[in-house]
Amino acid sequence: MKSFLVDQDGYYGEFGGAYVPEILHKCVEELKNTYLGVLESEDFKKEFDQLLRDYVGRPSPLYLARRLSEKYGCKMYLKREDLNHTGAHKINNTIGQILLARRMGKKRIIAETGAGQHGVATATVCALMDMECIVYMGKTDVERQHINVEKMKMLGATVIPVTSGNMTLKDATNEAIRDWCCHPADTYYIIGSTVGPHPYPDMVARLQSVISEEIKKQLMEKEGRDHPDYLIACVGGGSNAAGTIYHYINDGRVGIILAEAGGKGIETGMTAATIQLGKMGIIHGARTYVIQNEDGQIEEPYSISAGLDYPGIGPIHANLAAQRRATVLAVNDDEAIEAAYELTKLEGIIPALESAHALGALKKLKFKPEDVVVLTVSGRGDKDIETYLSFNEK
């Protein structure tokens, strides 16, 4: 049977690998040779599970959304990652990676962030574990996510606004990598998504796989079977999607639907629909689909959602799309906003703009009444209230 998980060289099919500058080769090799031994050790698992339970508040609920189910003619469950401490799925990964960094003897943590959720989650765990924390964030994102910036500062992190390029997630990642090049000995770079050189995509997917592990148990309790008919998640880099599908990736009974950011429309050039528009390239150390021009220069992506405007895609998802294991839909800004308002009015849950893209995919799908569908609400919408309000006023 074909496996959609990573091979020993860090590839998912033809996607992935580790293309890094020579100065970082030693750091990436050290990480590659260390991560599995630590993640699979009993003492790590014990500490990780205890923190997920007592600090994050896991397991996150699997909620049967009755009014949404009625509207879309199926049994619609929401995996409530928005209810985690810090308000998103990101903390599952930051706890795991910072526990790893501590075991590797690193004293300084650096991170990139787009919507600010990964930055807040990193700053939170650094405060908990008494580690120095530096977060790189594009100036555009600093302005549109200022509440998260203030939270990071309150938690003791240094937030560095990045003024190169489009001043968004890609540029923040570039600066974080530059910092890592300058401080390879004492610094651990914590990537927030399933992107970057191997072993990051696999490590982040493993740490987020607690999501699908819980879905299996929760569905068994609620439905008497451990698998849904469909899983739906939004993808930027792809960490919440990877966590949602991890334990089902090789299970042909389960349909995988990924919603990427269509922006103002995939034909407009103002988009972040990487899987649909990207060509094979290398970005931040991985071979994957990249939005690029005819000369191979990376194009600036656009999305109303700060967490989805990335011009690449995690290699795990690029491979799923290439092998037709996943259905990929582009959801435009206005469709996502409309879906967020719909969830709020039907179920009393205000989702993050990123999660709203997964909800926006529902109108593009047809379900049977007996279908069991699980959609991951990756984060809560507090950080996006101003965007929702300004869009509604138009």
Swiss-Prot record:
Where are its TM segments located?
A: none
Catalysed transformations (reactions): (1S,2R)-1-C-(indol-3-yl)glycerol 3-phosphate + L-serine = D-glyceraldehyde 3-phosphate + L-tryptophan + H2O
Q: Which CDD domains match?
A: Trp-synth_B
**Keyword tags:** Amino-acid biosynthesis, Aromatic amino acid biosynthesis, Lyase, Pyridoxal phosphate, Tryptophan biosynthesis
Quaternary context: Tetramer of two alpha and two beta chains.
Extract the PANTHER family matched here.
TRYPTOPHAN SYNTHASE (PTHR48077:SF3), TRYPTOPHAN SYNTHASE-RELATED (PTHR48077)
Please identify the protein, giving its name as recorded: Tryptophan synthase beta chain
Q: Which organism is it from?
A: Bacteroides thetaiotaomicron (strain ATCC 29148 / DSM 2079 / JCM 5827 / CCUG 10774 / NCTC 10582 / VPI-5482 / E50)
